[in-house]
């Protein structure tokens, strides 16, 4: 997820450059790979940008020496096109009179780009964003005034966006929002607009939150806002003040990044699905490789292994020979030509996964990767690269990245099975509705489990990987010893530890309810306290049950197990964002 800042002032000065740089530094927590700034002064529009960290780019490009009365700043998290100087934002039109920064995914950018190129427009980057300044330019050529041209450009876009645009000679910043955050900060003689409140918090605490499908512009002293039907919105009743410090603001009011990122999962899933829809040709090539492979080896570590296990089970059920591999055990696998390796890694840098795919490539296997970081090491060494669109994840324990891994896998499976993709379009709402429904009960369960020393998580079939992930999560951040087992294996040893009050969490995706019910009764007979997470089919005699209805059970279960672990951790007074002894990316074997 990119960081965006815009400032428009009555006065032209270098101070705005310093303020822009300061704002970009406060947005660094989002994660990024490149930085860029645009300014408008009496000398015209100027762009300075490069790949690298804020401090590096500021020094290299002498950004703090820029002058102007309008500034745009952007930190880019690469999605379309690798992290390079030319792919960094802001992007401009053919004549360098219009500059745009953008966060989100433009689903129809390929069609728009082809149309604009046929009209003579020249592109300089590989990004989806660059179509926006060219669209504005094209509409202005047709006689529209700047705001009308901006509105027409926005109407041409399909997908998600937070867009800021400036035009040389204009003392205003145009903006539009859909599915990505934009907030206006109201100052004295200057106004701000940003993706996050921390960007402008030192300068004003008066804010106006832009809602989906709203657009408008800010000047140094005014805000103009319209809804999607062109109705002018009275902003006075929506202005409010915040009493936050910088750290609190970066969490957008949430007490921890982990809970914030769980709540970001619906948007992350939407952007992931939208991206896969727009790149359906890639998905179909991946499907052909899967169909033609003698064996599909699915490799991942930790949470990514659990997502991979889910995928492997589904492939085997479809008659496609698949082997799930824990990445750190890659050396046990004897791969050969004809094998296809599906590598899953949030960071794209996990050393065990990287070493595994290198070994298997050397034996003739093809590599497909699913990562959250464009042009990461694993992606670079893959024949086909699929990217999640979760955005940066600050919390060490994977939450929204696990959910987007599952969403990506489910999308691939839907295409493989030739299912109607309309169901996948519902995925963001399914995740959102689940979170809204279960937050209270997951808190209660988390508070109870926080008092326990040992927990079993049981599942069968496709719910087993979710049970494994649930046990890992509560182990990682609440420091409660938890073990996951196939429920049918519980009587082959684990049940010997069950006594009165022993907590057992049963994950039931609705597929094998009767068998799970038998396992529940076996545990119950020995005094276990049963917590059930059930989708579409209720279990009998559970002590506490979360009941869900869902077209995509796995996407409903994922946030439930994350929330339970989160509330267990905070009940014990632990920081769930920074669990002891763990790192976000493991780069040593």
UniProtKB/Swiss-Prot annotation:
EC main group: transferase
MF annotations from Gene Ontology: carbohydrate derivative binding; glutamine-fructose-6-phosphate transaminase (isomerizing) activity
GO-annotated biological processes: carbohydrate metabolic process; fructose 6-phosphate metabolic process; protein N-linked glycosylation; UDP-N-acetylglucosamine metabolic process
Primary site of residence: cytoplasm
Record InterPro entries: GATase_2_dom, GFAT, GFAT_N, GlmS/AgaS_SIS, GlmS/FrlB_SIS, Ntn_hydrolases_N, SIS_dom, SIS_dom_sf
UniProt keyword list: Aminotransferase, Cytoplasm, Glutamine amidotransferase, Repeat, Transferase
Intracellular or extracellular location(s): Cytoplasm
Pfam families (UniProt xref): GATase_6, SIS
Domain Glutamine amidotransferase type-2: 2-221
Record-annotated active site: 2, 584
Classification via Gene3D superfamilies: Glucose-6-phosphate isomerase like protein, domain 1, Glutamine Phosphoribosylpyrophosphate, subunit 1, domain 1
Gene Ontology, cellular component aspect: cytoplasm
Catalytic activity: D-fructose 6-phosphate + L-glutamine = D-glucosamine 6-phosphate + L-glutamate
Residue runs in coiled coils: none
Domain SIS as annotated: residue spans: 286-426, 445-579
E.C. code: 2.6.1.16
Quaternary structure and partners: Homodimer.
The protein's role, per its UniProt record: Catalyzes the first step in hexosamine metabolism, converting fructose-6P into glucosamine-6P using glutamine as a nitrogen source.
Protein name according to UniProt: Glutamine--fructose-6-phosphate aminotransferase [isomerizing]
Protein source organism: Sulfurisphaera tokodaii (strain DSM 16993 / JCM 10545 / NBRC 100140 / 7)
Recorded name of the encoding gene: glmS
């Amino acid at each position: 997820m990119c960081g965006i800042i815009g400032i428009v002032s009555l006065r032209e000065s270098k101070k705005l450059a310093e303020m822009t740089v300061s704002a970009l530094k406060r947005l660094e927590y989002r994660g990024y790979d490149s930085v860029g700034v645009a300014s408008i002064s009496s000398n015209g529009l100027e762009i300075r940008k490069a790949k690298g960290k804020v401090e590096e780019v500021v020094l290299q490009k002498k950004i703090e020496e820029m002058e102007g009365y309008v500034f745009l700043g952007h930190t880019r998290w690469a999605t379309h096109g690798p992290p390079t100087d030319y792919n960094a934002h802001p992007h401009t039109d053919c004549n360098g009179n219009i500059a745009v920064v953008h966060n989100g995914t433009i689903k129809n950018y390929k069609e728009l780009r082809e149309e604009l190129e046929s009209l003579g427009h020249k592109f300089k980057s590989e990004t989806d964003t660059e179509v926006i300044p060219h669209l504005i330019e094209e509409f202005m050529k047709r006689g529209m005034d700047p705001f009308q041209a901006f509105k027409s450009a926005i109407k041409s876009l399909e997908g998600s966006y937070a867009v800021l645009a400036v035009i040389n000679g204009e003392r205003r910043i145009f903006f539009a929002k859909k599915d990505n955050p934009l907030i206006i900060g109201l100052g004295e003689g200057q106004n701000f607009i940003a993706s996050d409140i921390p960007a402008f918090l030192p300068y004003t605490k008066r804010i106006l939150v832009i809602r989906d499908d709203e657009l408008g512009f800010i000047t140094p002293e005014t805000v103009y806002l319209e809804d999607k039907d062109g109705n002018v919105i009275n902003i006075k009743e929506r202005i409010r003040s915040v009493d936050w410090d910088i750290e609190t603001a970066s969490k957008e009011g949430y007490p921890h990044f982990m809970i914030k990122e769980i709540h970001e999962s619906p948007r992350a899933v939407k952007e992931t699905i939208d991206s896969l829809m727009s790149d359906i040709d890639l998905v179909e090539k991946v499907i052909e490789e899967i169909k033609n492979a003698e064996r599909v080896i699915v490799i991942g570590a930790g949470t990514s292994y659990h997502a991979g296990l889910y995928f492997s089970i589904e492939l085997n059920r479809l008659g496609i020979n698949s082997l799930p591999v824990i990445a750190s055990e890659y050396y046990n696998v004897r791969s050969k030509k004809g094998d296809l390796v599906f590598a899953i890694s949030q960071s794209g840098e996990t050393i065990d996964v990287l070493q595994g795919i290198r070994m298997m490539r050397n034996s003739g296997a093809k590599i497909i990767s699913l990562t959250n970081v464009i042009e990461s090491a694993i992606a670079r060494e893959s024949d086909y690269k699929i990217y999640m669109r979760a955005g940066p994840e600050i919390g060490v324990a994977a939450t929204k990245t696990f959910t987007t891994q599952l969403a990506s896998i489910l999308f691939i499976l839907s295409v493989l099975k030739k299912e109607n993709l309309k169901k996948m379009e519902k995925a963001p709402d399914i995740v959102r509705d689940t979170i809204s429904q279960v937050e209270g009960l997951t808190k209660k369960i988390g508070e109870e489990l926080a008092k326990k020393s040992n927990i079993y998580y049981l599942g069968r079939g496709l719910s087993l990987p979710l049970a494994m992930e649930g046990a890992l999560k509560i182990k990682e951040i609440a420091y409660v010893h938890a073990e996951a087992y196939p429920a049918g294996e519980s009587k082959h040893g684990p049940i010997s530890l069950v006594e009165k009050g022993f907590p057992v969490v049963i994950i039931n995706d609705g597929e094998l309810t009767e068998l799970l019910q038998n396992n529940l009764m076996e545990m119950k007979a020995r005094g276990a306290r049963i917590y059930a997470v059930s989708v579409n089919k209720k279990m009998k005699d559970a002590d506490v049950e979360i009941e869900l209805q869902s077209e995509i059970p796995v996407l409903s279960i994922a946030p439930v197990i994350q929330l339970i672990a989160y509330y267990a951790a905070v009940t014990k007074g632990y920081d769930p964002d920074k669990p002891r002894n763990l790192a976000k990316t493991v780069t040593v074997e």
